[in-house]
From Swiss-Prot:
Originating organism: Arabidopsis thaliana (Mouse-ear cress)
GO MF, one example: hormone activity
Disulfide pattern: 34-43, 63-69
Gene Ontology BP annotations: calcium-mediated signaling; cell-cell signaling; regulation of growth
Major localization class: secreted
Signal sequence range: 1-17
Record's subcellular location: Secreted
Protein known as: Protein RALF-like 13
Length: 72
């Protein structure tokens, strides 16, 4: 009896289930954090894509005069 109920449920699930369409690619909006509703700090406001981003930190070799590193 239990086996018949399980078979009936499996058959009903197979008939009711709809095929799912898949995509071969991920849209850019899905991986762009700045395009979401709450962009993290550092994202440019909408419409400012043409502007150059401001550098966060200036470049430094990590070597100062006190360490007597080799000069270029």
């Amino acid at each position: 009896m239990k086996a018949w109920v399980i078979c009936l449920l499996v058959i009903c699930a197979a008939v009711i289930a709809e095929p799912v369409e898949s995509r071969n690619y991920i849209e850019y909006g899905a991986i762009n954090k700045c395009a979401g509703p709450n962009p993290p700090p550092g994202c440019n406001p909408p419409g400012a894509e043409q502007k150059n981003p401001n550098p966060v930190n200036e470049y430094s070799r990590g070597c100062s005069k006190i360490h007597r590193c080799r000069r270029d």
